Each structure stands twice: as structure tokens, then as C-alpha cells.
UniProtKB/Swiss-Prot annotation:
Organism (species): Pyrococcus abyssi (strain GE5 / Orsay)
Protein's name according to its UniProt entry: Uncharacterized protein PYRAB13970
Superkingdom, taxonomy of origin: Archaea
A GO MF label: metal ion binding
One of the Pfam families matching this protein, by short name: FAA_hydrolase
Membrane is among the record's keywords: no
Amino acid sequence: MIRLPFRDGYYEVRPTKIIALAKNYAEHAREMGSEPPEEPVIFLKPPSALIGPNSVIVLPRRSKRVDHEVELAVIIGKRAKNVPAEKAFDYILGYTILLDITARDLQAEARKKGYPWTVSKGFDTFAPIGPRIVDKRELDPSDLEIGLKVNGKVRQLGRTSEMIFKIPELIEYISSIMTLEPGDIIATGTPPGVGPLRHGDKIEAWVEGIGVLEEEVIAEDSILC
């Protein structure tokens, strides 16, 4: 169970689903070899991929290239279906940081074959979250610095104002397709600079006004008995 500080207590992170955005920062779309999309590109990550702050990301043996992606995450506060953009903030509980860890080689292989690429996003430990949840009333998410360091060196740096599709648009779009339940998480996309992780790496990911999410990285082979 993951419990994150929230208001004067703690919040149990128990989503029915994690909805993530692909290519929601134009420069990231281009570094992936694509043009910015004309409508949101969404995919799902399993809740079983979640881990809390100061935990361990495990690099699976099946992948030779695992990348980091830092994202501003939205926590849904109440049931949402067909929500218009102008009312979207009424359905938000708060904000946190989520790392969309990705097995890039498996993703590329799936894309080449025309397959869905859930395999690249769904490994255990591939959705670190934290370090806390900030009440929506305490943070304007429209223009925040977002970044990530590996071993003290900056890899990713951007601002949430660079999102192609803003949070209200995302909630309107997603809730027109599927019902959002309390606790569901929307990971809003990543700025450019994604890159590989290796055994022993230390990650510091931040979003202005939320804090720093710290994780360590180990190879699966190093923990097998």
C-alpha cells in the first residue's frame, strides 16, 4: 500500500487505472520521431506498477533499454463522466509526480509489429509516485518547472505550460471515453530529454510546488537468488 502525505494526514493511492499521455510535449514528440498529435494520445499503465518515494525501480531482464519520463500527475477526486473542460477542476483532488518508466526497446519492437505497447509500460515498479499530493486549491498547475536528474545531472527540464493539451482538455477527452473514478491518476506527459537508466542510478524528479521524488535503480538480475 502506498500512502502519500496529503493535507494534514495521508492519502492511500489506490487507483482503478492510470491514464498516461504520449507526446503531450511537442519537443518530446519530436525526439521520439513524431510530430505533435492533433488529439490526445492516451494509454494505460497498471496500478500494480506503482511504487512510493524512496523505493527501487527494477530494470527487467527482458529489456536492454529502460528510460525515465517525469510527469505531473493529476489525482481524480470524484467520479467523472463526460465532464466539460470548464468544469474539469471540480473533479481534481490534487497533484503529484509520476515517473512513466518505459522499456524503450520493447516499445519500439511492439510499434514495428503494429502491436499495443503495454508490455513496455507495465512492468512492476514502472510507475513511481510521490513525494506527496498537493491540494488542488494550493497549486496552479498551468506553468510549473518540471525536471529530472540522474546521478545529479539534469536530463529533463521543461515547464507544464509547454503541454499541448492542458489538464481541462485532458479530463474532458478522457472522461468522454471512460469513467474516471476517485483516486484514478492522469499522467500528463513528459518534457524532452528522456534517456536510459542503469543499475545503481539515483533519480531525483521534481515539479515546482510539489517537491522531489527520489528513487534508486537496480537490475533484476542483481536481486535474483
